Design a protein with these regions (language model features):
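His-Asp-centered metal-binding catalytic motifs of divalent-metal-dependent phosphohydrolases/nucleases
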Residues: 93, 97-119, 138, 198, ...
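Short coil/turn segments at secondary-structure boundaries
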Residues: 66-77, 90-91, 106-113, 126-129
Length: 386
């Protein structure tokens, strides 16, 4: 049997010198005895999977509202796809797969219901009350809001490396605040991989959901050079008339193209930098990222994002749903701020303990699923629901 020490020895033997190692973790804020047959990063992964915030992701919107279709991505299915991509990339680069997976699984825990429209609404509502950003909220969840291990410690007591990875997880939608959670260290390579696994996943699966919903047309997709390239490859390998199979193959090709370019360019960058150990990675201050797409391919990815923004995210169908969502999130927020006793007792208790009301209301609403938020809205404002 491979116990923890043997697993750590396997990491030492097979990972690159610049990869994070469980056996050299900085540790946890609240010291704990090590597990017999799991490394600290494997233990973090398991804690994330078993926490309530992770389960709630299954009823949180990615692009299309949860009740609009059974096959559209939710935050949970997106998260699983990100973790899978991160492990694949980490394995190819001889990085720590378990750390990449743990960061990937936790990266969206702090998202509000109703996708990016919900996050934008919450940012506006919290603008003068300490701010809101979903990466910072993910850290609040794993550090404070999850209650599985009280009274031993608040939150999940994750390792420094996983928390650091969440702090450094930045996408085009994010402008991290992280007040009181800053660090001078740069991101680990594993954190950078999780970041790109997120981007690769939503670039591909938003195309999948968009075409499946018929909001995104094939003609519109071809405005992206990368989409057109993936479609040409798929059509050469799929029989005429097999539209679903064609869509699947386009999405697969989009993922393959992104991962292949990322691996090739990152391998070149690692060779150029010649990092001797993890400390060199964390101290890196170069202008050119280490984990990245090649410049030419990055332009293609940007074109794909522009197409998705114009043709899918800003489509009448998606905007109509999101505008409605924004309106009722604001109404709920304002009602709970003015009458906080309408929230569950645990949240009221936090206000009594002098946690700011706006922050508590933010925590409550950000933790809601689409379905629960819809039910709470009805209870607050529908005279026929009690």
């Amino acid at each position: 049997m491979n116990d923890r020490k043997q697993l750590e020895a396997i990491e030492d033997a097979h990972l690159a010198p610049y990869a994070m190692r469980a056996g050299k973790s900085v540790g946890r804020a609240f010291p704990e005895a090590e597990h017999e047959y799991r490394t600290c990063f494997q233990r973090d992964r398991d804690r994330i999977i078993h926490c309530a915030a992770f389960r709630r992701l299954q009823y949180k919107t990615q692009v299309f509202l949860n009740w609009e279709g059974d096959h559209f991505r939710t935050r949970l299915t997106h998260t699983i796809e990100v973790a899978q991509a991160a492990r694949t990339i980490a394995r190819a680069l001889a990085l720590n797969e378990d750390l990449c997976e743990a960061v990937s699984l936790a990266h969206d825990l702090g998202h509000t219901p109703f996708g990016h429209a919900g996050e934008h609404a919450m940012r506006d509502l919290m603008r003068d009350h300490g701010g809101y950003e979903h990466n910072g909220q993910s850290l609040r969840i794993v550090d404070e809001l999850e209650r599985h291990y009280q009274p031993r410690f608040p939150g999940l007591n994750l390792t420094h490396e996983v928390r650091h990875g969440l702090m450094k997880h930045v996408t085009d939608y994010d402008k991290p605040l992280f007040k009181g959670l800053t660090t001078r260290e740069g991101p680990s390579l594993e954190a950078q991989v999780a970041n790109f696994a997120d981007e690769i996943s939503y670039n591909a699966h938003d195309v999948d959901d968009g075409i499946d919903s018929k909001v995104l047309t094939w003609q519109a997709g071809r405005k992206s050079e990368l989409f057109a390239e993936a479609e040409a490859f798929a059509r050469a390998n799929v029989p005429e008339g097999e539209d679903d199979l064609l869509r699947y193959q386009v999405v697969r090709r989009l993922k393959d193209l992104q991962v292949s370019d990322l691996l090739a360019h990152t391998a070149r960058r690692l060779k150029e930098e010649g990092f001797s150990d993890v400390r060199a990675v964390l101290a890196y201050e170069g202008k050119e990222p280490v984990v990245d797409f090649s410049p030419a391919f990055k332009a293609k990815v940007k074109g794909l994002k522009v197409m998705l923004f114009n043709e899918l995210y800003m489509s009448r169908t998606v905007r109509r749903s999101m505008e409605k969502v924004t309106r009722f999130m604001r109404q709920m927020f304002e009602r709970f701020v003015s009458e906080p006793y309408l929230m569950p007792g645990g949240f009221v208790k936090r206000i009594e303990q002098r946690v700011r009301t706006h922050r508590v209301v933010c925590d409550y609403i950000a933790g809601m699923t689409d379905r629960y938020a819809k039910e709470q809205y009805k209870k607050l404002f529908d005279p026929d629901v009690w």
